[in-house]
Swiss-Prot record:
Signal peptide: 1-19
Keyword Glycoprotein: yes
Protein name: Drosocin antimicrobial peptides
Note: Unlike many antimicrobial peptides that kill bacteria using a lytic mechanism, proline-rich antimicrobial peptides can enter the bacterial cell to target intracellular processes. 'Buletin' is named after Philippe Bulet, whose dedicated efforts in the 1980s-1990s characterized many of the Drosophila antimicrobial peptides, including Drosocin.
Positions of glycan attachment: 28, 32
Propeptide: 20-21
This protein's UniProt keywords: Antibiotic, Antimicrobial, Cleavage on pair of basic residues, Glycoprotein, Immunity, Innate immunity, Secreted, Signal
Gene designation per UniProt: Dro
Length: 64
């Protein structure tokens, strides 16, 4: 009697596990939503570098 109850319980657990669809595995471990934010960040850093170089460069001396 005890064996049949355990067997039925295991069968129910197995049926529930098979019936619920599993999560699809992502292709990469850390999937990114879109590559655009990284590109925008790179462009912003490049613009910041250009502005820093322009600020460091001394202004040209104009003849009087």
């Amino acid at each position: 009697m005890k064996f049949t109850i355990v067997f039925l319980l295991l069968a129910c657990v197995f049926a529930m596990a098979v019936a619920t669809p599993g999560k699809p595995r992502p292709y990469s471990p850390r999937p990114t939503s879109h590559p655009r934010p990284i590109r925008v960040r790179r462009e912003a850093l490049a613009i910041e570098d250009h502005l820093a170089q322009a600020a460091i460069r001394p202004p040209p001396i104009l003849p009087a």
